[in-house]
A protein has these predicted regions:
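HAMP-domain connector/hinge
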Residues: 10-16
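Conserved beta-strand-loop-beta-strand hairpin that lines the nucleotide-binding pocket
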Residues: 1-10, 38, 51-133
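Conserved short strand/loop->alpha-helix "switch" segment adjacent to the catalytic nucleotide/phosphoryl-transfer site
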Residues: 16, 20-48
């Protein structure tokens, strides 16, 4: 389910269908803002990766996509187990699943700004930004 404000869409993530819905919407928003197809695809991939992590590790959470004048912002939030070693996750090569996904470190490389706040036992918030060029 998605909530919409004038420049923002919030998606409840509970399953793969929710992840696909958020990804498609994020792609459309990025294209609407004037991002080239390749850049819009990067935003969509990051939404998909973050949504997949919510589904796999937290069970549920939200992804919020916000349009700003010169950038798109993606915020993924959950109240799952948290990430014990954020630096290790950002360095790449760290996984707790057998998936072939891009992962957090790959998502970071696709965006212009990327930050993670996580507390073990309380959850994780990821903020990712792609600037319109």
């Amino acid at each position: 389910m998605a909530e919409r404000q004038s420049n923002q869409r919030r998606f409840s993530i509970k399953n793969v269908v929710d992840v696909v819905r958020a990804r498609r919407s994020g792609l459309g928003i990025a294209l609407e803002m004037g991002f080239h197809q390749a850049e819009a695809n990067r935003v969509a991939v990051v939404i998909s990766e973050l949504g997949r992590n919510i589904e796999l590790y937290a069970g549920e959470g939200t992804i919020t996509v916000t349009m700003h004048d010169r950038y798109i912002e993606v915020v993924a939030e959950d109240q799952g187990p948290g990430i014990p070693d954020v630096d290790r996750v950002l360095a790449g090569g760290y996984t707790t699943s057998q998936g072939m996904g891009l992962g957090v470190s790959g998502s970071k490389r696709l965006m212009d700004e990327f930050e993670i706040r996580s507390t073990v036992g309380e959850g994780t918030t990821v903020r990712a930004v792609k600037w319109l060029r």
